[in-house]
Amino acid sequence: MALVDLQQTVEDLDASLSSIENVLDPEAKKAEIADLERQVAVPNLWDDQENAQRVTSRLSALQAEIERLERLRARIEDVHVLLEFAAADDDKESLAEATTETVKLREEIDALEVRTLLSGQYDEREAVVTIRSEAGGVDAADFAEMLLRMYLRWSERHGYKVEILDTSYAEEAGIKSATFVVHAPFAYGTLSVEQGTHRLVRISPFDNQGRRQTSFAGVEVLPVVEETDHVDIPESDLRVDVFHASGPGGQGVNTTDSAVRLTHLPTGIVVSCQNERSQIQNKAAALRVLQAKLLEKAREEQEAEMNSLKSEGNSWGAQMRSYVLHPYQMVKDLRTNHEVGNTDAVFDGDIDDFIDAGIRWRRKNETD
């Protein structure tokens, strides 16, 4: 890149970062950090462990956000200095270093710009994700497991902690369903664009005649419920069933009735959990998921009443992405038209570009 072009690119990045700072308001966040630090300093903070966890998690997230902004600002200033050296002394080494750093800065600032689009009521929350096999028999169950691995690898790439709450294995291969929590700030806002029906087209490895098979799996994304949401569920509204936890092929993984299934009688919503060690832990985990589902149900009802529910591409069951492995290889988002030919990379968790495109698409539809 020529020096003059590089200088303009850096000026544009500088302006983009300033716009991001205006949206994120770092000074307000620093004031909130100071308040949270005062709360953390209180000796009896951990007497209320749930509140303490909320305070410390929020503090860590804000500190990381401020550090990220300050680091980007410092790096842009460093590039300005390198460009001054390159212009004054025809320093090719400084120009090369500035070029490399500018490419990295563009990627990071673009990603941060997408983050500023996450301003929904629950976007800052952690996420509860459920994957279910749909039409397509054993291929659908196998596809559901492929999607589970994809999201686990995506979380791993970002350093996010994942807690698997429940896995229901199919008899021949794959899974009937799986539910997990992504413990990361803005996990809900980020992953909510993945909600919908995903379609796989391939030569079925389970078909002796090697025929092409189309199968489907559904992804549901909910925000983790917090204490301030006041989602109270009377015991009288619950039916609690206990059963043996099972593994692949229907194998029992323990000899006690530790797995728990909760049925919310007023709505008919059913949630199960079998991955914790005890019945008490499984019931608590299942209750968290049930609360998240009830919170989402209330939110959808409220939006419907306000006649503002935008269901295209976001609703459970709306087809949103196709994964074609035969006769060619292509993953395509049906809402944004973003597509990638490297299907192996996608199934290995390289889906940030799809998520970013989905977030931009959602914001555009919200503002149109």
Swiss-Prot record:
- Determine the domain of life of the protein's source: Bacteria
- Looking at the keywords, is DNA repair present? no
The molecular function GO annotations come to: translation release factor activity, codon specific
Q: Which GO terms describe its cellular component?
A: cytoplasm
* PROSITE patterns in alphabetical order: RF_PROK_I
Query: Where is this protein localized, as stated in its record?
Result: Cytoplasm
Q: Which UniProt keywords apply?
A: Cytoplasm, Methylation, Protein biosynthesis
Q: Which NCBIfam families match?
A: prfB
HAMAP family reported in the protein's UniProt record: Rel_fac_2
Q: Which family does it belong to?
A: Belongs to the prokaryotic/mitochondrial release factor family.
Q: What does this protein do?
A: Peptide chain release factor 2 directs the termination of translation in response to the peptide chain termination codons UGA and UAA.
Under what name is this protein listed?
Peptide chain release factor 2
**Taxonomic path:** Bacteria, Bacillati, Actinomycetota, Actinomycetes, Propionibacteriales
